[in-house]
From Swiss-Prot:
Subcellular location(s) per record: Cytoplasm
SUPFAM superfamilies according to UniProt: P-loop containing nucleoside triphosphate hydrolases, TrmE connector domain
Native source species: Nitrosomonas eutropha (strain DSM 101675 / C91 / Nm57)
Listed name of the protein: tRNA modification GTPase MnmE
Residues annotated for K(+) binding in this entry: N225, T244, I246, T249
Amino acid sequence: MKNNDTIAAIATPPGRGGIGIVRISGTNLEQLAQTILGKLPDPRHAGLFNFLDQNNQVIDQGIVLYFPSPNSYTGEDVLELHGHGGPAVMNLLLTRCLQLGARLAEPGEFTLRAFLNEKLDLAQAEGVADLIEASTANAARCAVRSLHGEFSSAIHQLVSALIDLRVLVEATLDFPEEEIDFLQSAHAVEQLASIQTKLEQVLSASRRGNLLQEGIKVVLTGQPNVGKSSLLNRLAGDEIAIVTEIPGTTRDTIRQSIEIEGIPLHLIDTAGLRETSDIVEQHGIARAYAAIEQADLVLLLVDGRYGVTKEDHSVLARLPKELPVLTVHNKIDLSGQLSRIEEDTSGTAIYLSVKSGEGIELLRTVLLKTVGWQTNIAGEGAYMARQRHLQALLHAKELLKRAETWLHTADQLEILAEELRLAQQALSSITGEFTSDDLLGEIFSNFCIGK
């Protein structure tokens, strides 16, 4: 991927619309602008221009914005042609730019150039894509915070504190005769504890943001005819799955995404789990267990008239031990019970009626609580973190935990210094201060063309 040539792309979505935008970025765009527009636009002023082809015939007329470097999105000269949003017009404008020496931009290349020219750090650049992809209002707000640098600022504060501690440890290594007293007088233990506390706070906010971005996979499982498909329909507010009195009606996984308080939930209805000689149903049951392996949470539905049966215990025994399970006692309208939540050492159980709707709101609340979402603070203060961010934060947390041990071992300060260095490196990878070219290519390849 070259970074010193001129790139162009249609920056608006495919299809017809009132406005379409062709974006161009590069060095010395004056000649290209004068050729297409007849003259160079005034910087940072919206102007009305004719867009000209190679024969000086008008392709379209629209608004032009010109941002000379370095005061632009990419840090290079940027020209935006705002025309009528028809595919033919947009393609003619883009073709004209390519005729004049620009090349078609690769996905995410405008934002990559912004990163390389230090207009954005890597976390902010990812915030651009996350804002575009946000599916809920809370997710969009979190993405804006990342784009504005709040997540990066928190990471930079951690890195700065780590650097201060590393300087202290490295100085101690250079003057071994001062070793123990020097570390104690500088309160190194307290410094490390403070960093660990702040890291835990950032990790918590990042986990909440990750929930907003990726949502949670919730698998509905249990014996046939306990109300799994009916619950899917009730939560989705639509007749997504076929419901009958015939056991084994659901033969395949049925997926539906919903939103609860801004959190995307990806519901997966599965075939009823039982012993069967039906080949098709057996395949459905195999798919049910495969879906469970990928789940963040399992709802085990049981018939509230009979409670958790021997067959239900057999299902529970096959579930991954670390997987959160919420037992849902359905059909309380038939058993005369009241909707409620029960929690004990065996986990959480909720009693409801899918048919009447009694207890459904309780279920919504418990779903969020089970996955660690704090309703009272919603998305406030959350960072739109990706899986790579969480992995880096968790790796840094583990390294600092090991560093805590070595800090109390005066003859192992070299290992302590290395653990702190690696923790700093892990955190710096989030903002791109320590990042491989392969990772950059993977991140930006998932962006839109034109962004």
